[in-house]
Amino acid sequence: MEYLIKTPCGQLRGCPTNKEGVIAYKGIRYATAGRFEYPREVTSWEGVYDATKYGACAYQPRSFYNEEEMPKKIFYYNEFRKGETYEYSEDCLFLNVFAPENGGEKLPVLVYIHGGGFTGGCGHEKHFDVPVWPQKGVIGVTLNYRLGPLGFAVLPELKEEAGYVGNYGLYDQMTAILWVKHNIAAFGGDPENITIMGQSAGGMSVQQHCLSPLTKGLFQKAVMCSGGGTSKMLSASGPEKSYEFWQMIMEKCGASNLAEFRQVPAEKLFRIWQENKKASMGGGCSPCIDGRLVVGKGHEIVKRGEHHHIPYLIGTTSHDVMPPILYSMAKKWCAVQDTPSYLWFFERNLPGDDHGAWHSSDLWYWFGTLENCWRPFDSVDDTLADEMTDRLCAFAKDANPNTEEWTGWEAGGKSALVLGDHDSKMGNPSSLKLWVTMFTNKAPGE
């Protein structure tokens, strides 16, 4: 059987998945972009687009080494990537759509932005493949975006060329959301009922989109996992402080101008960046204030009331990266909203080791992909995953994560829905315990 649909861009061929009744349309090119250029949305193609296999992931450090030989990376490799094969390329602007086989009209849409510190990850690692959401009446979308130097380098020459600089990865994400808005009706989705969701750097990305005037109207709700909220400490700053660092990288790559820098092999660029990134405060790869998409510091934008006034789900895990800080940011974000906003705290100690509810552990449950994991999950995990996916899909439908079966989640930032080894309930974690955990974490994140 062929799974053909017609979109505004042209025809697409999808494929069945391991989830009953869920059809995948994989590796859809949503944009094109040259190196250090802003993305251009794809609006058409010729013939039938083969969307039966995933597209290439963005180049990232792990593209150029064997993760099994890197002790510091082995935990997350074993968890999410072991046994899988990934293709990496600078040509990486692909997204994946997961839709019900029997279709529907005006189904809610959930667009997920992966994490990885803005330097790693992709939209089809084990925990994303395949989300259970379409079985619950929600269309799912995952995507790739440019990472590391290719996604976040800044140079004065680049600003002179385009009028603004940096954040190529964020613009990729925005263009993917635009593509979804323009095309998702062909999959049965509602372009006026889009929820964006992200975890870690993906959650921070969602946060930036929720602070931006450029993205208003593109989505109606947002979910931020382990990366949402604002703080003075974690606010974006202007690109100027990083110019000197990236000029040094360009020189060390043997390039004397932009044209030559654009021709440097990706492996060489990543190697030289990694060798030098700790030599300067400007050596990181993360969002900067570009004056267009990112227009200022988050806490100042919120103070002025210029953020998106939409419903939010936001939360963290008990053994997260900087657990007391991330939880406090999420709690404060909920507290200042004038729209229904819901706080959660995930504390299920995953079976199989003693790492607790580590950074990213909740994703197995939000996506309903426990069967892809090596861990000895039991009925507690099955029930918890069912509750979390039910609540997430209910929120995507009408901004209320309570259902007939799963009730009691109160909006506001006074307390969180605590999800763990027990029946879910409203409460707050111990601040002291979070601080102790911060310094004893066994899987601090990647």
Predicted regions and their residues:
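C-terminal domain-tail junction helix/linker
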Residues: 412-436
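Substrate-gating cap/lid region and adjacent catalytic-acid/histidine neighborhood
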Residues: 221, 229-236, 252, 256, ...
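A structural signal for well-ordered alpha-helical segments within the folded catalytic domains
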Residues: 23, 92-93, 171-174, 178, ...
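Short, solvent-exposed turn/loop segments enriched in Gly/Ser/Thr/Pro and often Arg
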Residues: 146-149, 200-201, 344-353, 406-414
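Surface-exposed patches in mature extracellular/periplasmic domains of secreted proteins
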Residues: 192-194, 256-260, 343, 403-408
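Serine-hydrolase-like catalytic core of hydrolytic proteins
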Residues: 77-252, 302-322, 338-339
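Non-catalytic accessory segments of hydrolases
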Residues: 1-167, 191, 281, 377-388, ...
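Bulky hydrophobic/aromatic "packing anchor" residues in well-ordered structure
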Residues: 30, 36, 45, 261, ...
